[in-house]
Every structure is written in C-alpha cells, then in structure tokens.
Amino acid sequence: MGASVKPAARRNARQFALQAIYSWQITKDNVATIEEQFLSGDKYDEEELHASEPALAAPETDVAYFRELLSGVVLSHSELDSKIRPYVSRPMQDLDMMELALLRLAMYEMTRREDVPYKVVINEAIELAKVFAAEDSHKFVNGVLDKAAPHVRKK
C-alpha cells in the first residue's frame, strides 16, 4: 500500500466493491456499467443512503482499489469460488448472496494482494459482514476465512 493511501480509503473501497460485487451477482450486468453507476453515485441500492456513507471519490475512497477489487473478483469469480468451496459446509448455491460476495472479495485480496496482511483481510470482511450481511454472517465469514487462510497464503 502506498504511503499516500489511508487505511480508511481502502476500507471505503472495499465497502463499495462489496456492494458492486453484490449488484453484479444479482443483475449480471456488465462490470463497466456497474462501476459507472457506483462512480456516478447512481447505485442500485434500494435502501436509503446513510448520511454517514463515504463518497466514492478520492481522497475519501481509494477509487483505483475499488476498480481493482470489482473487476478482479468478477473476472476471476469461478477460480475464487473453487478456492472457497473446500471451506464451506454447504453447497455454494445455498450461500447467501452477500456472504458469497464477501467471501469472493476476501479471497481475491488473500490470493492476489499479498501486500495486504491476511489478518487485515479477515478483519475487514468481518466488519463488512456486520454492516451488510445477516445477523450472524460475520461468524460464518470468519470461520471460512480462518480455515482458508493457511492454505491460500503461504505465510
């Protein structure tokens, strides 16, 4: 991570990427279309936007990281799913869509962004699960990532 990128900007990038990945999973729209909707502020989100929600613009959000996460997860979702599958106790198609988006995002960071410590990846996924997923999803996400980390990261 460059010295100029703040952890909060990365956290915001993950938050927007998670929402965009979730949107892609539901709609299967073109990634560029979804990215543009998020960058323009015209999200699919049916819920009211919170006043405290960060802006998808620098310096508040690492926009380049958002783009990398979104396109990286979408382009490699099948490979990511094959890395996740051994660590989930139920069929992938039975996973909640938000849990799947979280696991794909975290697995992408674990396997493609060795500069991000795996403990940071897991912690960020847990925090996102607490905000965006079902009540106990953070426990499930934590369990899957804890089991997967030693096998996908050689550290």
From Swiss-Prot:
SUPFAM superfamilies tied to this protein: NusB-like (SSF48013)
Pfam families named among the record's database cross-references: NusB
GO molecular function, one term: RNA binding
Domain of life: Bacteria
A GO term from the CC aspect: cytosol
Keywords per UniProt: RNA-binding, Transcription, Transcription antitermination, Transcription regulation
Transmembrane segments: none
Gene3D superfamilies, sorted: NusB-like
Biological process per Gene Ontology, one example term: DNA-templated transcription termination
InterPro entries hit by this protein: NusB-like_sf, NusB_fam, NusB_RsmB_TIM44
NCBIfam families: nusB
Role description: Involved in transcription antitermination. Required for transcription of ribosomal RNA (rRNA) genes. Binds specifically to the boxA antiterminator sequence of the ribosomal RNA (rrn) operons.
HAMAP family to which the protein is assigned, alphabetical: NusB
Family per record: Belongs to the NusB family.
Protein name stated in the entry: Transcription antitermination protein NusB
Species the sequence originates in: Vibrio campbellii (strain ATCC BAA-1116)
Gene name of this polypeptide: nusB
